Amino acid sequence: IERAGLEPRIVTIPFDTPTPQRFALVQSSLDQACARSPIDAVFATDDLAAAEVLEWARTRDLSVPGDLSIIGFDGTETMRRALPHLATIRQPISQIAQAAVDILLEQMEGTLPRPIDEAGESPAPTLEFPGTLIPGRSLSA
């Protein structure tokens, strides 16, 4: 985004927003964002949010990907079946789960080495798991 000289606009919907209010909040937030300047792409934090953006675009007669590109984040089998055309980043859920279990077991057994930082804290380990782009028809070139 930075290399393209674009400045992202971040729209935040609280995670614990009940489903009936969530979609209305997504719609009003995107409407407000578009009132300031056009939106040409949305990177949703999960595939359900991306589905809500797709519905918002449909109700505003926006073409996806012509007018708006949308990509989600999850790539779960359920969402892939429901929205096979949605571009998404698939998380390696089994690897994440296995690493979480391994860390938990090491903590329970007391075998997890935890470095102490300058503040005397023992921060949790940082693990990175590469996602996989699942291209769909919701992205323009």
Give each language-model segment a name.
Residues 1-141:
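Bacterial carbohydrate/catabolite-sensing allosteric modules
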